[in-house]
């Protein structure tokens, strides 16, 4: 089981960090934070980044996994020198349930050059602007089943590309493929990276993120950095990022998603409007250089890092 492997790896890493010549130990997510006390005993400065409320994810909702992850969340809130969060929603959550002040440092993204369709044409028969794209881990909270259901009711000749791999969710992936049936226009690419990933982002007509639950989705930032028109669910973790630069639908509402998809399929000019605004906006507001500088401040213990990250328009041109 990957969960057990992750647990033992986190324990081993915490031991190595405790005895290693490190000043700061940075834990990512609640699960590994269970072992934060080990390097803490050795006088290390311990930082935790909370990427989302992981114990609430569908695959952990019941049983030991959820309780274990929530215990790690408690350890992080109580004992970490600093807790970094990626969204205001999670920041409010830690204040409400643990009375813990946190540092808000969202994910960042770099500007990207768009690639012409080459590998994706050879591998999957895809061409520019001829497909709707979703890219994520194939887990239930990502809402891909909503997208397939909505897509099957569309009047369009555009294909649906679902890029991503299972995450201990083989049963869910099997269900998705059963929903798709023998429709040749629904394409599962599996895990993609490198040039193939870049080409998928670069040539999509629309990028869709139908999640029920998120931390701060890096794939959303990447999709917009490539100049994509985005349709996302109206959860705070997406809506707060995109503001008015993307199209939102009601979370888990297949009918509303279908209407938004049909709208963009029928209105090329609307899609081009969102595409023209996406990259400049997202790369200006969520710049990796800012993220790195603020994270280093947290490592050093500067209190100024607790100020909310604001848009720096001069960075957008870099």
Which sequence ranges carry the predicted segments?
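Nucleotide-activated donor-binding/catalytic signature segment of Leloir-type glycosyltransferases, i.e.
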Residues: 173-195
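Glycosyltransferase donor-sugar binding loop
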Residues: 109, 135, 159-174, 190-191
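Membrane-proximal helix-turn-helix segments that form the acceptor-binding/catalytic region
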Residues: 15-18, 41, 65-83, 97
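Conserved acidic donor-binding segment of nucleotide-sugar-dependent glycosyltransferases
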Residues: 247-254, 263-269
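Aromatic "clamp/platform" in nucleotide-sugar-dependent glycosyltransferases that forms part
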Residues: 212
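Conserved donor-binding/catalytic core segment of Leloir-type glycosyltransferases
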Residues: 125-155, 161
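Short hydrophobic beta-strand element within catalytic cores of glycosyltransferases
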Residues: 229-232
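Short alpha-helical donor nucleotide-sugar binding micro-motif in glycosyltransferases
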Residues: 191-192, 199-204
